[in-house]
């Protein structure tokens, strides 16, 4: 079972693109079911609404008989960060953690403190060259501290996490979010595969199978799922 948490900066609802993502996950996993909740978003529903809805979806899967290790959390951008935040919450509250996490260009640092926010500022075709993007103008945290690990997982503890696959483009401003999380998680004993795709932009996997880099990334995700299947009944 794959629980897919969509991106959109915590302000955009689920889009048709994520149904395509769901189909790809289903195909690459050789038939895994995929649940894509349309979680509440800001500004009407700031933190912790998205986390609460992700948790409710996970609890629903457990109520249907799935074990934690049978569930893979998958997410892109905000959804990737939300997947990590959910895993932290589950661990912190003694609930079953998932069997793995797939994070595509995860947004893990809502303080925008990473080096790549500066070095890729003029390179990033989506968020670059402006301070008016969702990276800087975002209502999700509300009155809460942006360094809260349930908002910015980078500042949390990754001990007890399952294996993670993290994919990111080399020219996106969120590059540091992935690199820093991978380094920290590895230091804390987590198995992490970090794949930096040269010349790629934020969530380039939305090109589906139409460009070589995206095709390779989806194939990598499929192989990661295959590895996890050897240790659980996905």
Enumerate the predicted regions with their spans.
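Alpha/beta-hydrolase superfamily serine-hydrolase fold, recognizing
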Residues: 1-234
């Amino acid at each position: 079972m794959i629980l897919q948490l969509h991106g959109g900066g915590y302000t955009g609802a689920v889009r048709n693109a994520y149904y395509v993502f769901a189909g790809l996950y289903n195909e690459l996993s050789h038939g895994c079911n995929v649940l894509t909740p349309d979680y509440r978003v800001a500004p009407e529903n700031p933190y912790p609404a998205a986390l609460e809805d992700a948790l409710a979806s996970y609890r629903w899967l457990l109520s249907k008989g799935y074990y934690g290790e049978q569930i893979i959390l998958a997410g892109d951008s905000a959804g990737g960060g939300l997947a990590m935040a959910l895993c932290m919450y589950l661990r912190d509250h003694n609930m079953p953690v998932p069997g793995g996490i797939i994070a595509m260009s995860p947004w893990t640092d809502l303080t925008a403190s990473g080096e790549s926010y500066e070095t890729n500022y003029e390179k990033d075709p989506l968020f670059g060259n402006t301070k008016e993007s969702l990276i800087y103008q975002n209502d999700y945290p509300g009155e809460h501290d942006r360094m809260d690990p349930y908002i910015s997982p980078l500042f949390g503890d990754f001990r007890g996490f399952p294996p993670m696959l993290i994919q990111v483009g080399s020219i996106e401003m969120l590059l540091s979010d992935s690199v820093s999380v991978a380094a920290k998680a590895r230091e804390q004993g987590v198995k992490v595969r970090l794949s930096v795709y040269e010349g790629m932009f934020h969530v380039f996997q939305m090109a589906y199978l139409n460009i070589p880099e995206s095709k390779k990334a989806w194939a990598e995700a499929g192989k990661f799922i295959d590895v996890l299947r050897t240790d659980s009944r996905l």
